[in-house]
Design a protein with these regions (language model features):
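Flexible, non-catalytic linker and terminal segments flanking ANL/adenylate-forming cores
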Residues: 1-24
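Generic anion/oxyanion-binding catalytic loop in active/binding sites
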Residues: 16-19, 45, 49, 103-106
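Conserved AMP-binding/adenylate-forming core of the ANL superfamily
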Residues: 22-24, 32, 40-85, 89-93, ...
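Helix N-terminus capping/helix-initiation residues
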Residues: 9, 20, 81, 134-137
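Structural core segment of the AMP-binding/adenylate-forming
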Residues: 69-70, 93, 97, 101-137
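Short proline/glycine- and basic residue-enriched helix-capping loop/turn segments at helix->loop/beta transitions
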Residues: 36
């Protein structure tokens, strides 16, 4: 367990599982299953990209290989500051497949917030868009 992590109360977790809200399935396995079940269905779409589940699955594998190639190891924390785009989905699943722990940051966060998140999480890297919302990173 991560230091400082507070789990859901056991009773609520049990109720969520009983209701089917939680299926004790890793997020990455949900994408793998969807890619096998509905390979040609659209998984994610934004203004510039449209990926099927099979495409997103392949892109996530490529991203994971690239992330590992950069020296990111399983358990490493990585700040993710991306807008709501297809690129976010690729990065998130790539990080999960590489075994990294994504630390989500809002696109509006700036140096002070990112520095704080990096310090408290011991993040080793940052995934950021070149530009987002008119801000040049």
């Amino acid at each position: 367990m991560l230091a400082g992590f507070t789990p859901f109360p056991a009773e609520r977790a049990q109720a969520y599982r009983a209701a089917g809200y939680w299926r004790d399935q890793l997020l990455d396995s949900v994408l793998r299953t969807a890619a096998r079940t509905w390979p040609d269905h659209i998984a994610v779409i934004d203004a510039d990209h449209r990926h099927t589940y099979a495409e997103l699955d392949r892109l996530a594998d490529r991203a994971a290989a690239g992330i590992a190639g950069l020296g990111i190891r399983p358990g490493d924390r990585v700040l993710v500051q991306l807008p709501n785009t297809a690129e976010f989905a690729v990065a998130l699943f790539g990080l999960l497949r590489a075994g990294a722990v994504p630390v989500m940051c809002l696109p509006g966060h700036r140096l002070a917030e990112l520095t704080h998140f990096a310090e408290v999480s011991s993040a080793v890297a940052l995934v950021v868009a070149d530009t987002a919302g008119g801000f040049d990173h």
